[in-house]
Amino acid sequence: MKTSKVICITGGIGSGKSTLCQLIETRGYSVYYSDQRAKLLMNSQHNLVQSITVLFGESAYESGTLNSSFIADCIFKQKDLRVELESLVHPLVKEDFLRWCNESGDEIVFKESALVLETKDKNCHFIVSVIADENTRIKRVKKRSPEISESRIKEIISTQYADQLREKHSHLIIENNGKVDELEVKVDYLLSKVI
């Protein structure tokens, strides 16, 4: 099995980490999107579906599809449920990521994950944190998910690592308060540091 160099991209909700990763993909690099893969596993991995149903009840799935808004409400009201859910999902995502790396065959891969620092991800060779001011983050989340209230967005932000902690535990910080063309320049700088 070939070992890939793993560049982890992290940041809080609305920071622009997914946009950064999409720009990285346009330059020919492979990106593993942890949240997307976790949702895929939570919808397709039979034992995981059963465990989530036991943990959250029948409302966890609607017509065989994960009821994400119900799960989100539950884990914000009961922090212990979040910890239990993470203990079910994270090991499977880690396994899936390692399999994906092996299948990609790439020397360098990128991994997008909001929880790189919180979970002390051991697969990361280089950590990049994307940060943005709170108002910018709120506007971005409202634009893509208008059903989420501003107070809920602020609540989510308050549960995530502060930018000062990200700065302390990252190899590179990318400030993303501007437009995509400004981010393009920062992607090129990032690639020059890791390639």
Question: Where in the sequence are the language-model features?
Answer:
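ATP-dependent small-molecule kinase phosphotransfer cores
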Residues: 36-106
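P-loop (Walker A) phosphate-binding loop of NTP-binding proteins
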Residues: 12, 24
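Hydrophobic anchor at the beta1->P-loop junction of P-loop NTPases
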Residues: 7-9
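Small-molecule kinase domains that catalyze NTP-dependent phosphoryl transfer to phosphate-bearing small molecules
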Residues: 105, 122-123, 144-193
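Walker A/P-loop
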Residues: 18
